[in-house]
């Protein structure tokens, strides 16, 4: 356990940030999962809507520093590519 006052405060803020980041990452996984389920079902309209929502969440997570902007771009590109394959 930390003895320095600033470090005790830092432990608390780190814990809050960790919980917030965990929640955001969970939302991202859910959004990407919904895209993949729409793709496997072959429903292009639902997949396009899900990609839009997932892209928005990925961009927001990247802007908040939860994930790196390149990782967000890679994930957006990958799911968009999969949706484009749907006939």
UniProtKB/Swiss-Prot annotation:
Alphabetized HAMAP family for the sequence: Ribosomal_bS20
GO cellular component labels: cytosol; small ribosomal subunit
Role of this protein: Binds directly to 16S ribosomal RNA.
Spans annotated as Disordered: 1-22
Family per record: Belongs to the bacterial ribosomal protein bS20 family.
Keywords for the protein's UniProt record, in alphabetical order: Ribonucleoprotein, Ribosomal protein, RNA-binding, rRNA-binding
Molecular function terms, GO-annotated: small ribosomal subunit rRNA binding; structural constituent of ribosome
UniProt cross-references to Pfam families, sorted A to Z: Ribosomal_S20p (PF01649)
The protein's name in its UniProt record: Small ribosomal subunit protein bS20
Gene that encodes the chain: rpsT
Organism of this sequence: Clavibacter michiganensis subsp. michiganensis (strain NCPPB 382)
One BP term from GO: translation
Top-level taxon of origin: Bacteria
InterPro entries, A to Z: Ribosomal_bS20, Ribosomal_bS20_sf
